[in-house]
């Protein structure tokens, strides 16, 4: 009998877990975002060859965030991380107008993968502190997000170094997880 109440309590108040894959072109700010969320501070980063993985606790949800390197030579390896991914965070350097089409191509290629069909999409329009950064509406247009008819998605303007927008994005992800059956 006590076990029933323990399971009910855990179901109502227990921690949920969510597997998140964070990808984007190289130098978009993925690793800076990961460690800003994990440690609350800015870390000095070098290009990620392979991946970083950390658990971020937020609002009773344990996010396991896989930050995968974005250099073009290692992007084909992204697919090895797709299995069991519930949320995809795609990080865009909002200041990099020259590569936004490349970012769109990579995003659309990933979203076509069967293993990611049920994953929700959060786009971080990063580096909003830079003077020539595209705003979230412009990034939405350039990435073709409005064409995603059967995908739950959200875009959040962010600045990884200050942390602006990061927790708003996690709020959206946690609400999506809570609303899943």
Swiss-Prot record:
Provide the alphabetized UniProt keywords: Acetylation, ER-Golgi transport, Golgi apparatus, GTP-binding, Hydrolase, Lipoprotein, Membrane, Myristate, Nucleotide-binding, Protein transport, Synapse, Synaptosome, Transport
Please give the family membership noted in the entry: Belongs to the small GTPase superfamily. Arf family.
State the encoding gene. Answer: Arf1
Membrane disposition: Lipid-anchor
Please give the name of this protein.
ADP-ribosylation factor 1
The record's listing under PROSITE patterns reads: ARF
* Oligomer and partners: Interacts (when activated) with GGA1, GGA2 and GGA3; the interaction is required for proper subcellular location of GGA1, GGA2 and GGA3. Interacts with ARHGAP21, ASAP2, HERC1, PRKCABP, PIP5K1B, TMED2, PSCD2, TMED10 and GRIA2. Interacts with ARFGAP1, which hydrolyzes GTP and thus, regulates its function. Interacts with PI4KB in the Golgi complex. Interacts with NCS1/FREQ in the Golgi and at the plasma membrane. Interacts with PLEKHA3.
* Organism lineage string: Eukaryota, Metazoa, Chordata, Craniata, Vertebrata
The record's subcellular location field reads: Golgi apparatus membrane; Synapse, Synaptosome; Postsynaptic density
Q: What is its EC number?
A: 3.6.5.2
Q: How is its activity regulated?
A: Alternates between an inactive GDP-bound form and an active GTP-bound form. Activated by guanine nucleotide-exchange factors (GEFs) and inactivated by GTPase-activating proteins (GAPs).
Name the SMART domains on file: ARF (SM00177), RAB (SM00175), SAR (SM00178)
UniProt: GTP binding residues: 24-32, 126-129, 160
Residues in a coiled coil are none
One of the protein's GO biological processes = positive regulation of late endosome to lysosome transport
Chain intervals for the UniProt region annotation (Important for the stable binding to the membranes)? 3-16
């Amino acid at each position: 009998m006590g076990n029933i109440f323990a399971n009910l309590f855990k179901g109502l108040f227990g921690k949920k877990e969510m597997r998140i894959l964070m990808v984007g072109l190289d130098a978009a700010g993925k690793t800076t975002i990961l460690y800003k969320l994990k440690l609350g501070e800015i870390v000095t980063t070098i290009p990620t060859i392979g991946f970083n993985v950390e658990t971020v606790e937020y609002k009773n949800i344990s996010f396991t965030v896989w930050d995968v390197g974005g250099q073009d030579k290692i992007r084909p390896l992204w697919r090895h991380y797709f299995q069991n991914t519930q949320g995809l965070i795609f990080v865009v350097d909002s200041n990099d107008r020259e590569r936004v089409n490349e970012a769109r191509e990579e995003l659309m290629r990933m979203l076509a993968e069967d293993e990611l069909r049920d994953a929700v999409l959060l786009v971080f329009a990063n580096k909003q502190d830079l003077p020539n950064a595209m705003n979230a509406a412009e990034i939405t247009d350039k990435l073709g997000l409005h064409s995603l008819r059967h995908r739950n998605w959200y875009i959040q303007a962010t600045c990884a170094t200050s942390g602006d927008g990061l927790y708003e994005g996690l709020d959206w992800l946690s609400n999506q997880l809570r609303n899943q059956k």
